[in-house]
UniProtKB/Swiss-Prot annotation:
Protein name: DNA primase small subunit PriS
Enzyme's top EC category: transferase
Record-linked Pfam families: DNA_primase_S
Cofactor requirement: Mg(2+); Mn(2+)
EC number in record: 2.7.7.-
Family to which this protein belongs: Belongs to the eukaryotic-type primase small subunit family.
């Protein structure tokens, strides 16, 4: 990033943290602010410059003063609570528990245009909320949801009841929402169809319907290609596939001994696993299991996009549009040099840019410069 671009971004972030932009400032205060470790990344020409961390604050005012004077590119605080959060060594901090966090990021879910990625991740968020509140006993009021300012959402559970959970307990939770480790035997065993059992049966039913709809030769080739399934077994299965579909709905336990159904539902069988994945909430497992994680501070700016990390209630999610509601900079024109042709929606308008010099609204200019897609060419 060129020096002029760095200075442009520093100036705009300075204006935000110092209240020169309507609705600006990072006023949100996490639970027990004084027990959190804080970390910061800054706009710098030194590509090797790392995070400045092991910092603690005694009050919201002290944090606000730091943001105003230091103007960080990224602001993080620990999901963990510590007796001595500012200690330079992790062993000296004295861990006292941690919030449970789910990270939904497009980088792990889908690639494509920015607005498409954001819409897709939002679908995962709704699935996660449904599982947490409908199946795992958490109330909507327990959830602290933030747009990450980048390509996804963070869901916090800042509850005393989960604060002391270790990594294994947190892994069990994230494995549930992501559908990891589902057992064919337990999914087919007699019991009420709900939660993952219902989703599993739906995925298997869809896969059986897909196979039944294939040309006979293609279906036979697919089934005989499954581990342990001969062409003879596959042919016999195809003759009775409608009966298998009926059993899945009425007496699924009778399919426990069916070699072909078991092979179809094998964890290595990609078509069926794609059906499971589409019904899962694709949370990033390492984030949830990490009991000493740093997470983005709501109200701060994301140095990779220039957008705000926005707290959102469950009831606001449907209407929330990150490319409008998380954008803090306005429509003042700036001139940028784009690295390539692109099309980008922001603030309710779609902008088509060509490689080279373009005059764009400041909101888009900040975004492109933060993303490394463009450099400032004038217009501060």
């Amino acid at each position: 990033m060129k020096p002029a671009t760095l200075e442009f971004l520093r100036q705009r972030f300075f204006a935000y943290y110092n209240g020169a932009i309507p609705g600006a400032g990072a006023g949100y205060s996490p639970e027990s602010l004084t027990e959190r470790e804080w970390g910061f990344l800054f706009f710098t020409e030194n590509q090797r410059s790392g995070m400045r961390r092991h910092i603690s604050f005694t009050s919201q005012d002290e944090l606000t003063s730091y943001l105003k004077s230091m103007v960080p590119a990224h602001v993080y605080y620990s999901t963990a609570y510590y007796t001595h959060p500012g200690a330079a060594q992790m062993a000296d901090k004295e861990w006292r528990g941690a919030d449970v966090i789910f990270d939904l990021d497009a980088d792990h879910i889908v690639r494509g245009p920015y607005d498409i990625m954001l819409a897709r991740v939002k679908e995962e968020l709704f699935k996660l909320i449904d599982m947490l509140t409908g199946e795992l006993g958490f109330a909507k009021r327990d959830l602290r949801i933030n747009f990450s300012g980048g390509r996804g959402y963070h869901v916090h559970l800042p509850l005393l009841s989960v604060r002391g959970w270790d990594t294994a307990e947190r892994r069990e939770l994230v494995n549930y929402v992501s559908g990891t480790g589902l057992s064919f035997d337990s999914m087919m065993a007699p019991s009420q169809k709900s939660g993952w059992k219902l989703r599993y049966h739906d995925a298997l039913n869809d896969e059986l319907a897909r196979i039944a709809g294939l040309p006979c030769e293609d279906a036979l080739s697919y089934l005989s290609g499954l581990s342990g399934i001969s062409e003879t077994f596959a042919a016999g299965f195809l003759k009775n596939i409608s009966q298998t579909q009926n059993l899945l709905k009425s007496n699924p336990e009778k399919l426990l001994a069916n070699k072909v159904v078991r092979a179809i539902a094998n964890a290595e069988n990609e078509p069926f696993q794609a059906g499971i994945l589409s019904r899962a909430a694709q949370a990033d497992e390492p984030v949830t299991t990490d009991v000493k994680r740093l997470i983005r501070h709501p109200g701060s700016l994301h140095g990779g996009s220039g957008m705000r990390v926005v707290p959102i209630s469950v009831d606001q999610l449907d209407a929330f549009d990150p490319l409008i509601d998380a954008v803090v900079f306005g429509e003042r024109n700036v001139s940028v040099d784009c690295a390539f042709n692109l099309s980008m929606p922001i603030l309710g308008n779609n902008y088509t840019l060509t490689a080279g010099r373009n005059v764009v609204p400041e909101a888009l200019g900040v975004f492109l410069c933060c993303r490394g897609i463009a450099e400032l060419s004038g217009g501060i």
